[in-house]
């Protein structure tokens, strides 16, 4: 997204929770594995990658209080309609399931994936995208942020199917941290999938759009293909989760952790 409204944080910090762990409703779903296509993949299609790199794009929105629900629906439907631009590998937008940790009061999320940075750039300036931002997003949102990164070695479905749960984590690092510390953080997050079998996919990388990211420089997405029940199973392993968090906690200045369930096309609106 090109729109960014930088406002003062609306919440005090919650407890730092830099790695993928949470709980709540269960939405189990099955996913099917197909060959990696050369064309666009819709927001509900699932295909597999045999160790590939994708460009991740996540936008967080705070809808103004007391906004007419019909206008919120229009925004969500407009964002999901951007799959028609034939530039995305995957795109989903809708209300957040839960805020685990954040100094900001975000309400909605857009997650999309692209083959290349050029595809993301083309999406960003596309008239269809700009129209949705101008007509449906800016009039009802008083805060927006976006983070972009390249996820290398990603395997599994490129497009999580409806009912899949994702945990989005953004990390703001303490000043003057060296490359060694950044590398350690990235390796710890990459290793989560091997320690928690419920995590179906981990995408992590360094943000390459700093102007829009409020100072958050490392981002990750943990995908739970069978839904929130898998997320809850991971959250129940408190001691193991604490061990992983403690490995990087000293490097962190601020953390955003948000949970989201990929909606069906019919239920994407709020």
Predicted regions and their residues:
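Short S/T/G/P-rich N-terminal loop/turn motif that feeds into the first structured element of a domain
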Residues: 2-111, 115-125, 139-270
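A short mixed-secondary-structure module that forms the rim of ligand-binding clefts
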Residues: 125-129, 133
